[in-house]
Amino acid sequence: MLGSLTLGERGQVLDALVAERPDLAVEAERLAAALLSSASIGEVADEVALALLGIPLDALGARTGRVRGRGYVHEVDAAWELVEEAIEPFRSDLERRAALGSSDAASALVIGIVAGLYRVREPGEGTVLAYAGEDTPSELANGVLELAAKLGVEIP
């Protein structure tokens, strides 16, 4: 039954369980801390590469040309927007883990993001990432490294 629940429903079950059994709150906090204090560099790199290469061309087409309320939007600008949107969840996760003091996980996350960007440094023609420009992965990596420095995340 639990396996068929959505993530939101699982969260509701956890909230109800902790409310009903406050003694489980300590264990739930311990498990949450353990989860947030670790990050797999390889998994993060895979997720970043998949997120960037998985942006559909239809999304680019929907944002280029004449756009109501914006005027004409060039394909490079639209591609950049889409690429930035794809990388934003990883940047947000980095900020969250740094704010929580999970420095090892934050460091691993930075390395994973940069590794994922390195993997897609030569995107295939016709991909949204290619439309964004050949320097896009390196510019995004620089942005992540700047964010890490601003957050005080040390990279080994």
Task: Describe the predicted segments one by one.
Residues 1-24:
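Amphipathic alpha-helical packing elements
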Residues 22-156:
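Eukaryote-biased, non-catalytic alpha-solenoid scaffold regions
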